[in-house]
Amino acid sequence: MMGKREALHAILNGQRADRIPVIMNAFSLPVARYGYTMAQVMQQPDKMVECMVGTRRQLGYDGLCLGVYSGITRQIAGHLPNSEGKIVGDGDDVIHSFEDIKKLKEFHVKKCPWLEKMKYMIYRMREEEPDEPIYVIVHTPSS
């Protein structure tokens, strides 16, 4: 059987893998398991690392996961109306045509503080589990 990284590389290269790597994508489960709130782990990255690494170890996932879910979409698409015609500021449900894509604002890394925290968390996760793949999920504006 393929190892975690071998299977991932095969999948990313469009090749056949004999297994599908499984990761923890829902941050709320690890956070709840450790008794923290989302606000706490967002403000204290070491708590997020504790939750994600500990849950991976306990449940045997094939890697660690981090994500930037709202910062990017808010920044580049929060000004656009959703399918109900409302501007709610979250950037969700706003891309319905090529014209909508043209209305996206430029993304500025320095205006997204969560990215800096993510770099730190990747460093900490690598310290804790040097052999585990780390998957970074970036949420983009959606239809």
Predicted regions and their residues:
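Catalytic cores of TIM-barrel enzymes
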Residues: 1-143
